[in-house]
Each structure stands twice: as structure tokens, then as C-alpha cells.
């Protein structure tokens, strides 16, 4: 049996379901970051905000842009970032994994990452048309 990754609407709905639950509202921020940037919680450690909703990760040359830039705005990721997020990232990650294990969150991290990778490939191929091979000059 094949498993299909969640569609965009499912991800957005799950984010707002988390956001409206007072006990899980901080998890919503982490969920939104994973969905928007396609990074695991561990990879988010030490990030900083870059231009135009991108984030800069230590050890990466270029900023990481969201596949859906509107998600950074809709989810208010910059504004809703926990004040001491560096200190509580490990705790937030554990809480998110537990919530997923007990099915309090309908979309797991693996599915979010898979969905992000698929959309990234799709949008990259749409942005860059395939190169057409041209015959070499003088060759018939």
C-alpha cells in the first residue's frame, strides 16, 4: 500500500488546529517551521531570519527560502517565535514527537518533509524549463 503525503490544505488545517489549542500553541510554531522550510527540528537549531522570509542556517552558504512564502506570513512564524526558542527547542521537539505518537497531531514530521521535498521538486521544474538539445553546427 502506498502512502501519499499530506496536501497543502491538510497542513494548513493541522497548523491552525494546533494554534487554537492553548496547550499546543507553541508546538504550532515548530510545526509551521518544519512545514514551511522542510527542515527537521534539529536542523533549525541556531537559525536566524534572513531577507524575504528566508532563514539562515549555520553551515549553509545560502539562506533557505520557503516553498510557500505565504505560509511564513499566514503562520506568523517570525512574530510567533517563542522568546527563548533556543533553550526550549529540544523540549518543543520532544513534545511535538509525543503529540504525533499519540495522534494529537494528524500529520507527522516525515510526511511534512516528504511533502516539502515533492513540492520543491515540482516548483523547481516549473520555474526552470527543460533545456532543449540543439544540434551541433555542421552536424546533420
Q: What do the predicted segments below correspond to?
A:
Residues 2-41:
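Basic, Lys/Arg- and aromatic-enriched nucleic-acid-binding interface segment
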Residues 4, 10, 20, 25, ...:
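Positively charged, low-complexity intrinsically disordered regions
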Residues 12-13, 45, 113:
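Generic structural signal for individual residues within well-ordered alpha-helical segments
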Residues 31-38, 78, 100-103, 130-133:
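Hydrophobic, Leu/Ile/Phe/Ala-enriched alpha-helical segments that form helix-helix packing faces
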Residues 33-54, 109-110:
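Short, charged phosphate-coordinating catalytic segments
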Residues 54-100:
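Basic, alpha-helical nucleic-acid-contacting "clamp/cap" segments
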Residues 86, 93-140:
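Short, basic (Lys/Arg/His-rich) helix/loop patches that form interaction surfaces
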Amino acid at each position: 500500500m502506498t502512502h501519499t503525503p499530506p496536501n497543502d490544505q491538510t497542513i494548513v488545517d493541522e497548523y491552525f488546529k494546533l494554534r487554537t489549542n492553548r496547550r499546543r500553541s507553541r508546538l504550532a510554531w515548530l510545526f509551521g517551521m518544519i512545514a514551511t522550510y522542510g527542515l527537521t527540528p534539529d536542523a533549525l537549531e541556531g537559525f536566524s531570519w534572513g531577507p524575504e522570509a528566508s532563514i539562515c542556517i549555520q553551515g549553509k552558504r545560502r539562506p533557505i527560502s520557503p516553498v510557500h512564502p505565504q505560509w511564513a506570513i499566514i503562520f506568523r512564524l517570525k512574530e510567533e517565535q517563542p522568546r527563548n526558542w533556543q533553550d526550549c527547542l529540544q523540549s518543543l521537539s520532544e513534545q511535538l514527537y509525543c503529540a504525533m505518537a499519540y495522534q494529537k497531531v494528524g500529520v507527522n514530521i516525515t510526511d511534512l518533509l516528504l511533502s516539502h521535498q515533492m513540492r520543491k521538486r515540482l516548483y523547481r521544474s516549473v520555474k526552470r524549463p527543460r533545456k532543449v538539445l540543439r544540434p551541433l553546427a555542421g552536424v546533420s
